[in-house]
Amino acid sequence: MRPSDRTPAQSRPVTITRQFTAHAEGSVLVEFGDTKVLCTASFEEGVPRFLKGKGQGWVTAEYGMLPRSTHSRMNREAARGKQSGRTQEIQRLIGRSLRAAVDMKALGENTIVIDCDVIQADGGTRTAAITGACVALVDSLNWARGKGILKTNPLKFLIAAVSVGIYKGEPICDLEYIEDSEAETDMNVVMTETGKMIEIQGTAEGEPFSHEELLSLLELAKHGIREIVDIQKAALS
């Protein structure tokens, strides 16, 4: 039995609120249950030095958690003077995932900077961030097309992400914090809207998992992401 009484395949309620802030070209508040992440997409002219003159764009991401997004306050990383390894890992994951969804040639020599700030954390912050950032990215691309900066749509497909894991011996989808902290296996999966894999991050926290359990987890993720993509499409319609 899960703490929330959800079935093993059941995700938390997902809500996507677009145009959540006034200034960014794309901004989204994404909620996976009690996990809430603000995702903005800023469209900027120019590209990093290593891409200058190559006729293609770039998508990059930053990720952070507000000090009281967790049960007890944590210091801002800026106050500590450096980012944690976890933060660097997550923002690279977000950037990689979103770059898979964009035709960089069609983007031209422009950069989209994604900022994901966790307002409240209850597990699955990175998967919520990817899901919300994708919608913010779409809005920023539509803004650029509306301004005549882009002639064609660089978006190849929507992407979304969900966590899966083995909790008390049972594969489950979309882990909240209490499940994540006690899971024998924890996995984050990023997929396209058609069910193709972009990234799989999986770790046996306790007992090693079998090939059959891996396939079961991926099937749960595919089902969960399909539902999340439907919510993205409804938000964008």
From Swiss-Prot:
Per its UniProt record, what PROSITE patterns does this chain match?
Answer: RIBONUCLEASE_PH (PS01277)
Q: Which cysteines are joined by disulfide bonds?
A: none
So where does phosphate get bound?
Answer: 86, 124-126
Task: Name the UniProt key words of this record, in alphabetical order.
Answer: Nucleotidyltransferase, RNA-binding, rRNA processing, Transferase, tRNA processing, tRNA-binding
Molecular functions per Gene Ontology: 3'-5'-RNA exonuclease activity; tRNA binding; tRNA nucleotidyltransferase activity
Biological-process GO terms, alphabetical: rRNA catabolic process; rRNA processing; tRNA processing
Q: Which family does it belong to?
A: Belongs to the RNase PH family.
Q: How does it assemble?
A: Homohexameric ring arranged as a trimer of dimers.
* Substrates-to-products reaction catalysed: tRNA(n+1) + phosphate = tRNA(n) + a ribonucleoside 5'-diphosphate
Q: What is this protein called?
A: Ribonuclease PH
Listed EC numbers: 2.7.7.56
NCBIfam families cross-referenced by the UniProt entry: RNasePH
Q: What does this protein do?
A: Phosphorolytic 3'-5' exoribonuclease that plays an important role in tRNA 3'-end maturation. Removes nucleotide residues following the 3'-CCA terminus of tRNAs; can also add nucleotides to the ends of RNA molecules by using nucleoside diphosphates as substrates, but this may not be physiologically important. Probably plays a role in initiation of 16S rRNA degradation (leading to ribosome degradation) during starvation.
What is the name of the gene encoding this protein?
rph
Q: Which organism is it from?
A: Shewanella sediminis (strain HAW-EB3)
The record's section on SUPFAM superfamilies has: Ribonuclease PH domain 2-like, Ribosomal protein S5 domain 2-like
